[in-house]
Amino acid sequence: HTMGGVLLRSPCAVGDSAIPPRDMETYQKMGEIGERLTGYPCTPVYDAFPELDDRGRRNTSGGFIEWTYDHLGIFSFATELWDLQSRAGIEKPAKDPMRVVREQTEEDGLKLLKFNDEQLGGRCFVRWSEFEHPQLGTVEIGGWKLKEVRQNAPSEFLLDECERNAAFSVRQAAMTPKLAIQDVEVEKIADDAFVIRALVVNEGYLPSYGSEMAQRAGIAKPVEVQIEGAEPIIGKKKQAIGHLQGRSAARGMMFAFGAGKVENERLLEWLVRGTGE
């Protein structure tokens, strides 16, 4: 299924306080971008489904996006595609946007029927009619075509939904770490001895470790740099240089202390023996 027109994010079983502050800033920034591109509100699963189970607990544990964040450190979203309610002119509450899906009023129902008549030619609601059921006797059959309009976008709206949500997915991918070697200098100091200097930079938005949660989970490997074609005299052929911050760190520093330098680059140097130009 997919319905509701909302961007769901972690956490699922607990509140936002369980997320490290810097990760929370990133999640909120991604959510703002998603809201702008898709028109959907962004909310944690924990807030979107406040119903309690028979033991007085929220029944939202076990979400896949919570696992990908908690165990893999990946900022993940579950998109409930197709916002029928907003298309029909039904206003969503900011703090509980799924409520209009769970608790439909008579006024909302009339707006949905009007949308069906004016935008869909009335095809997605079947008028109730009697039917003789072999076991149940006389019954009535009719109502909404759930798969065609309630749980999925009608065909004439599908392309627009796909374009807006694909744009959000591409934008998320563009925010990942992006390691690059911006400058390399080679200084010849003897016939077969050279000093090599290289500036390693993270040009991406996220830090090289991805998220604070990835570091907590112990899966964020440090950046490694390796040289080939020469034998190091000073310096290692392959070395770990730790992690490099991304542009997201500048956002946090600006709010807290004003503009500052982001540690997103590392200058490395080797003395090597070899031949070449």
Predicted feature residues:
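Extended low-complexity, serine/threonine- and proline-enriched intrinsically disordered segments
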Residues: M213-I233
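Short amphipathic, basic-aromatic surface patches that mediate peripheral association
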Residues: V200-Q215
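Low-complexity, intrinsically disordered segments enriched in Ser/Thr together with acidic residues
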Residues: G258-E277
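Generic structural detector for well-ordered beta-strands
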Residues: E185, Q226, E269-R273
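Metallocarboxypeptidase
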Residues: H1-I189, F194, L199-G204, E228-M253, ...
